[in-house]
Amino acid sequence: MNNSILLLAFSLCTLIATGDHAQDDYILTREYAVTIDGTSNLRDWKENVGQVTGDMTAIVNSDGSVDLVSIRIKMAVLSIKSDMGRVMDNKTYDALKATRYPDILFTLSTPLKLSQVSDCPQPVPVQGDLFLAGVCRPVVMQVKTLALDRGKLLFEGFEQIRMTDYAVKPPSALFGTMKAAPDITIHFKTNFIKPALSTLLKNQ
């Protein structure tokens, strides 16, 4: 029996066995994109987060709605790379206190139901806690959710934050000539999949 047949059989068995109100665990795949956008007195700048991990518990109902029970996403500070080069990278690590707090962490604080998981999803407010540089603050992100093939769930959205709210001093470079503004926007696109399906897909 080839992997495609195994994958189909697993998906059908899962659908029949669970129905509504069955919680499933998901893991974050490597198909993600997380960027940090900001501006300065000289020009706009962008940073890419290279290492992101996460897990989620959700209920996919027969009517197409999704109940989000828990989400945890972790971003490695030292994997952040700037389009302004290594000097800006090091300034970012210092500003985020990477030695003491190596990860940026988001956790869902309020479970919610997503009634529209369609080809054209509308953004919904998702409440969570953002832990950054040793400070934890509540956030409300606008998130779109899309159900993909092979049991994947895609989440796409953004969050605007002010660095000084997290006791982070905006980084500067070029001997202080370039000074970053305190407001930044975190954009993200993440895919979650059930661990067993992830294993089958890797073996195809």
Please give the residue ranges for each predicted region.
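Bacterial N-terminal signal peptides that target proteins for export
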Residues: M1-L7
